[in-house]
Amino acid sequence: MNKNEALNLVYENILGEHSILIQLRRGEGLNEDRFNELVTAMQFLIVEYKDLDIVPKKLALSFVDISNYFYFNEDKYSLEEQNLIEDAVQKISQLANELFDYW
């Protein structure tokens, strides 16, 4: 994976027309393959940008208030699915914090 591939995976899975977020809102559940792809891309970008003071604006935009986008009508999912989604949100938030950690 290179930097551009990782960035595109983040953009597709967070901002894209068929993003993980849109799939969840449609009641399609968490696509674990796409989620794992997103996590791998984020981990790559954490290493790529760890010593830099700047990141692409679109990358930063991808994670602005990201956790708010995961809250929706919970009646769509069973308690087990809700817990899985909540774990995914926490993982994405944790990785975003690492990605943008300035200190």
Q: Each PLM stretch: what is its role?
A:
Residues 47-63, 83:
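Short, charged early-sequence alpha-helical segments and their helix-coil boundaries
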Residues 6-9, 23, 41-44, 62, ...:
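Charge-rich, solvent-exposed alpha-helical interaction surfaces
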Residues 1-35:
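Short terminal alpha-helical segments
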Residues 30, 51-55, 76, 80:
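Alpha-helical structural elements of signaling/regulatory helical domains
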Residues 32-52:
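Mature extracytoplasmic domains of secretory-pathway proteins
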Residues 13, 27, 58, 62, ...:
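Short acidic/histidine-centered micro-motifs embedded in hydrophobic/aromatic stretches
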Residues 17, 21-27, 49, 73-77, ...:
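Secondary-structure edge/capping motif, primarily at the C-terminal ends of alpha-helices
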